[in-house]
Amino acid sequence: MKMMCKVYDFEAGLLKAEVRKITKGDFLQDMEDYLGKMLDGRQRLTRSYLLSYPFIVKYFSEVENITFDKLILGVYLIYGWMPRALCFNEGKPLSQEDFVELRAKLSEVQKWSEKHFDEMLGKDGCASEKGKEGKSLFLLKKVTNGSIVGMSKLLHFINPKFFPIYDSNIAAVVGEVKTVDEYFAYVKAFHCFTKEILNHDSEEFERIRKDFEDACRKEFGNQTNMEVTTVRAIELVLFQIGKSIKDSKKTAKNP
């Protein structure tokens, strides 16, 4: 019996009572507020993420030529963004055959677009772990600690215009993503949500995105490779909303 993949509803997530308590109910207004606060001097960890971001994107920009040792170092580099220690490939040596397959897959996903993604998925919008695409991505998950979060970050740094990062903060808004199939469903829903935002007011969205990108470049030394993609901007807002939800719950438990 074929399992139906999970469906993620971003709009419903933003309408949850715990979200509405901390937002204005208008995504573009919330976007301007949350992105504006990220460069606050008190947000040291957040600022550290923003500072290091373009360097990691640049590291993976020529992934088709990445060597075995640089792939391993790159995955450890990404885990510098995470609270958990990395157990690379379950502590087992990565075979040359698996490395070649991984490099080929990473080189391929660097070119993915929404059109390619839709063609790759089945009619139900799911990936199949038994197919060629699924096997390669399950191997990718394996080398990133068996973690969907780690895998999503690697995919994002490979192709920041298409793959959104997923973590526990975003889960607080849209729900949990536990499998490769569910991550694919999350990506598909993310792009549907993005279209709705842009259809609502693409000019205002672009103004806010560009203002934040320019502010980051000014703050961190006018880095020419400091690009905040549409995907990255929306993901950052969801991250900040989710983080605020988690922080408010902690405060409620320990007033």
Where are these regions (language model features)?
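An N-terminal alpha-helical hairpin/helix-loop-helix interaction module that forms a charged
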Residues: 1-142, 160-255
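Short hydrophobic alpha-helical segments that form membrane-spanning helices or hydrophobic packing faces
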Residues: 150-157
